[in-house]
Amino acid sequence: MAIRDTLLPFSHSKTLWEVSSVATVFGIYSFLPIWKDHSPYADIADLPSGLHAALSVVVGWLLVFRTNTAYARWWEARTLWGALVNASRNAAVKLTRLVKLPNEERQQVKMLLSYFPFALRDHLRNEGNLDDMPEIKNESQIKHIPSIIIARLYERVSLWKSSGWIDGDELRVIDTELAKFLDICGACERIQRTPIVRSYRYFTRQCVMLLLLTFPWGISNDFGWWTVPLTMLTAYFMVGLETVAEHVEEPFGRDEDDLDLDGLCHTIENSVQQIISTEATT
């Protein structure tokens, strides 16, 4: 049952079908050197096996570096969103525990903290949406909604200070917590706006294609009809690594390999609402 539950989602994976299609094309292509070996041209233009082995090593190192670089971006993004979960919980606790707020102020804090992750998600996807934020919906030419939300929180904190609800020490504690939100936002923007160098991506793809085009010609003499499945298997893994790297290097989208930002947003929303609601009853 566990194996079936693991394989079923994979079998419906978009990446799987993309890679399998490419592997099938190279499998069909690998019939050419087999045909040549059984034709009058069998001794013409044989590819030295040593050349192919050297090319395999080079492409292997390129793919390792390519995959590691892409995954490092994905993992950094996941770490930042994990930090956002913690920052939201800490802010909810300190904003409601350090200050005895009226219910209206609590609702404002809850609304702003709950909406920040959704605003950041949409901002990283270039999908600004103000429908759930009536306070800022009417402001014109808003380009950075996460900053506006934090600015609204600072306006509330400034009001609390001028009203005597918090002192200077409490203000510094709250400022430290709120500053984390825009730090995380800026780090996410750095990942989003600094893609892997396009020339490097193209160069890696060209090397993979060159290797796969020469692979069956280098092994057909030794493996005969086994050249077809070996070529398909090699193409599957090499193209698969390149495809996975391409998908995970942009972690904020909607693909199946991207971060589950919707789930993380709802986790933060539920945590903030639970913390503030609990504080209100104590």
Which ranges hold each PLM region?
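Membrane-spanning helices that line or support transport/gating and their immediate boundary helices
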Residues: 70-74, 83, 94, 240-251
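Structured inter-helical modules in multipass membrane proteins
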Residues: 93-200
